[in-house]
Structure formats: C-alpha cells, structure tokens
C-alpha cells in the first residue's frame, strides 16, 4: 500500500493556526511534528471563490461554504451519513455483490463499471451495512487539538474503523462547547 502524501486534517479550537503549527515540521526543531506545509484554504475561498486542491469546505446551515466554522454552524447531515449517500452505497453493493438488476440508466452504468471490481467490496467490507457506513462517513487523516494530535495509520487495516468511527470519536458532543472547526491541507513527513 502506498503512503498518502497530501492529507486533510481537522483542527479543533479557536486558535487553529497556533494548534496547526504546534504539530508542524515547519517549526524548526519541532519534535512533535506529524506533517509539514499546513494550509487552510479559507482565504483562497474568500478571495477567489476557489476551493482547495485537496479538500472541500464545510457546507454551512446558512447555505454558504467555509473551511473554518463553529461546530453548530456546519450542516453535518449533508456530509456525514447523508441519506442520499447511504442509499447510493446500498444500491452499489446490491448491484455488484448481490447482482441486482439495475433500475435506471445510472445504475446500469454503475453496474457495468463496477462488476469487474466485485472483489473490492467483498475483500474490504464484511457486510453491506459496513460498506454503507464507510462510504457515507465523514473523516479526515488527522485531528489536531491543543492537547494532542491523532492520525490514521494508513499502513494497516485500522483505516476502515477510523473512517466509520471518526465522527463519533472526534466530533460527537461538540455542540455544547461549539468550538471552531478548521480544515487544513498538509503534507506528510515521509
């Protein structure tokens, strides 16, 4: 498996720039470095209207987009376990693994493109429900807070568990404190 070079991470906290720098190799002699070249694309979005190269902004409840927003302003239902994504992943599994008949042109196209990749589904996901959770889950490669930095280990099978449990582990319950959540693009050290 190839190690991923560019990563998106979440930084949780009002002083997001300081937190992001805290774990960056761009600080000379930083022994707590996990990445380098950390950038938030918010300024680019505001000035040019362009989104980042490796990350998508949060959809906000007011209809706008942002790379940095208060937890309660983000429309989490659009990006985590979205019913449309859940249904699409369910149908993909049924078409490819269960060999269901396509109901429309989009499904015929999907089945034709994915049928030779049936092993992707069966080798990586124990059940349809696990695939649906994985496909529709919001996740990032790392999370930085004032207290610590955690990231997924892309070299082992824990990536599936990381993706499925990301929201519950790092974001669930933050509505009470309503912290600033910021997306950063980073470059791995290796």
Per-region residue spans from a language model:
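Acidic (Asp/Glu-rich) sequence patches and key acidic residues
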Residues: 1-169, 173-176, 190
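C-terminal or internal capping secondary-structure element at the end of a domain, subdomain, or sheet
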Residues: 178-190
């Amino acid at each position: 498996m190839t190690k991923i070079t560019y990563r998106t991470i979440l930084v949780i906290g009002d002083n997001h720039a300081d937190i992001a720098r805290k774990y960056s190799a761009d600080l000379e002699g930083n022994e707590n470095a996990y990445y380098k070249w950390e950038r938030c694309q918010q300024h680019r979005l505001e000035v040019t209207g362009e989104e980042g190269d490796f990350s998508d902004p949060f959809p906000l409840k007011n209809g706008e987009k942002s790379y940095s927003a208060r937890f309660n302003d983000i429309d989490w239902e659009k990006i985590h376990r979205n019913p449309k994504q859940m249904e699409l992943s369910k149908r993909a599994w049924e078409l490819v693994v269960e060999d269901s008949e396509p109901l429309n042109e989009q499904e015929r196209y999907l089945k034709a493109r994915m049928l030779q990749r049936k092993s992707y589904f069966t080798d990586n996901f124990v059940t349809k429900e696990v695939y649906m959770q994985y496909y529709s889950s919001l996740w990032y490669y790392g999370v930085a807070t004032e207290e610590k930095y955690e990231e997924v280990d892309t070299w082992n099978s824990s990536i599936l568990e990381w993706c499925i449990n990301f929201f519950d582990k790092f974001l669930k319950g933050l509505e009470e404190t309503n912290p600033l959540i910021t997306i950063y693009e980073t470059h791995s050290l290796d």
